[in-house]
Amino acid sequence: MTLEIEFLNHLPVLINDMREKIGRSRYPLLKMVAEQTTGLILYMQLDDKIKYSKEAEYVKSFLLELVNLLKDIGIPQKILVRDEESYSWLLEFCQLLPCSLEISEKLPVIDMTTNNFFSDL
């Protein structure tokens, strides 16, 4: 099983609900896990980085969610991420599993899902 994971990139959609509280709109973060062979989205959530005082807290919360998901679906053979930053956050985690971790500029299932979602907005 190969998983595509996205958790550090902002979506190109403004959230205006906090404009009055913080004086500006912001872009949500997408947390998504997809299984590459079947094309299934196994986990998807929009999150707001403003809830976390440090990026490490945000990543820790995502890793806990990922652990819970892997308890249900099993350990993948490979995890694909889009960038060096995601890779560095997940490297030690993947070594503990163990599973391979690779950077891939394209995450086909996640890309198709986000493109389809945002083409309708």
Positions of PLM-derived features:
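Secondary-structure boundary/capping micro-motif
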Residues: M1-L121
